[in-house]
Design a protein with these regions (language model features):
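Short His-Asn-centered micro-motif
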Residues: 18-20, 49-50, 180
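N-terminal cationic-hydrophobic initiation segments that often serve targeting/anchoring roles
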Residues: 8, 59-62, 124
């Protein structure tokens, strides 16, 4: 859609976009339900970037509602921050680590692997087997319908692990939702 907009508005070309689905927007499609609630049928799509140019370009087409996504995972009877951070580890294991000690702790539980090929490998090599089982294995199986050992490492490699208390899912400078939805 960006290419179509640029062709039309910069080069004066006529553009036709054909969407395979019966609505515009692809997976970012959203709609208001009968109660006025904005629904994302394909799951939430949170805009995030570190690029001021991209943010300014898109700001021509929408006003923004600032939004920083935070996730709590239900683990062992507790609601814990996800991505895994300092508070996650301290609360889950009853520790009192500092941010300086956190990386050493992660290194001590991480599995040393010669090759990281699967999503399981990617996670256990960063946070160890226990955290993998508590946070990643079941969720990844539910989301993808496959065991993480059957998925490429890139599937879970993008999920960060933080050594500080930052509990935002994304750390990008610009995080928001279009004020009136994507579509």
């Amino acid at each position: 859609s960006v290419l179509a907009e640029r062709l039309a508005n910069v080069l004066g070309q006529r553009v036709l976009i054909v969407d395979k689905r019966p609505h515009i927007g692809g997976n970012a499609y959203d709609r208001y339900d009968d109660h006025g609630v904005l629904v994302h049928p394909y799951g939430p799509h949170i805009f995030h970037t570190n690029s001021e140019d991209i943010f300014e370009y898109l700001s021509q087409f929408t006003d923004w509602r600032p939004y920083q996504h935070r996730v709590l995972a239900s683990v062992d009877g507790q609601l814990l921050p996800m991505p895994i951070n300092l508070d996650t580890i301290n609360r889950l294991y009853g520790l009192n680590l500092t941010s300086f000690e956190m990386q050493d702790w992660l290194d001590s539980v991480a599995e040393k692997l010669d090759r990281v090929e699967t999503s399981e490998d990617a996670v256990v090599s960063k946070v160890g087997r226990d955290l993998y089982n508590k946070f990643f294995r079941g969720y990844t199986r539910k989301q993808w319908g496959l065991d993480p050992s059957e998925l490429d490492a890139s599937v879970t490699a993008r999920v960060p692990t933080r050594t500080n208390r930052d509990d935002r899912y994304f750390a990008d400078t610009y995080q928001a939702l279009p004020k009136h939805g994507y579509t």
